[in-house]
Amino acid sequence: GYGSQRLASFYADYLAGAGPMAGGEPLKNAPAENCAHIAFYLRTGADDRGFYRNILTGYVKEEFERLQALHPGLYTHQIELIPGKGHSIDYRPTTPWLKQYTRNPYPKYVYWEDFEMDGLHRKGFYNLFVKERPNDDINARTRYEMSITDNHITLNVDNVVYETVQKDPRWGIEMKFRKNYTPAAKGKVIIYLCDELVDLKKEITVTVNGKQAFQGKVKPHLKT
C-alpha cells in the first residue's frame, strides 16, 4: 500500500490508475494533487491502527474529496475504511474497479508538486520539462500548475514549504500538514505542445506567474 500510494503521486503521468491496499501514507509522502488524471482506489481496514494507517487513510479521503470538489471531473477516487477489518482485507474489488479507466496522455490541466524520492527528482511531468529547478536544495519542493484554455497557457510556479500541524506523540510520525506557497523567483521550464493541446496553426500565448512570457506561433518539430 505505501509503495503504490507514493508511486501513484510520483509517476501519475505514466498511469491510468493506482490501487494501494492496506496503506495510508502521510500526504507529504504522496501529494494527492498530482493524481488529477488517474483513478485512485485505496482500501484500508477501519481497525488497522498500525502506524495510524486507518487515520491516515481518512486524511487521504478528505483530501481527495476536497480536490474533487475544486475540480469536478478530476481526482476520480474510491477510498474506503472497511468496518471490522484490520490489516488483512479483501483485495479483490480493486482490480475490477481500476480496469474501467484509461490513461489521459494529453491533459489540459496539470498540477505537479515536484518532490524528492530516494534522492531523485523527476525531470518532467506530462508535457512539462524542467531545465532548471527554482531551488538547488534537493529537499525543496516546487508546485507547477498549468491550465490550457483554447490557445492560452497559464503556468504558475511556486515554492512549497510544509508546516507540520499534527504529529503522533509515540513515534513522532508527521500526520497532518499545512502548505505555504511563494512564487518561484527563478527556474526554467519547457512546455511541450501538440495538436491535442492547442491549435498549432494559430497564435499561442503563455503567461507565467501572472506575466506574459510568450506570444506568437510555434513550429512543430521533433527536437528535444
Question: Predicted segment positions?
Answer:
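Short loop/turn motifs at secondary-structure junctions
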Residues: 13-15, 36, 188, 197
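Extended hydrophobic/Leu-rich segments
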Residues: 11, 45-48, 52, 177, ...
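Short, solvent-exposed turn/loop segments enriched in Gly/Ser/Thr/Pro and often Arg
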Residues: 1-2, 83
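Alpha/beta-hydrolase-fold serine-hydrolase catalytic core, especially in secreted/extracellular enzymes
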Residues: 65-224
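Short glycine-enriched nucleophile-adjacent loop
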Residues: 3-12, 18
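The feature captures the conserved acid-bearing segment of alpha/beta-hydrolase catalytic domains
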Residues: 16-99
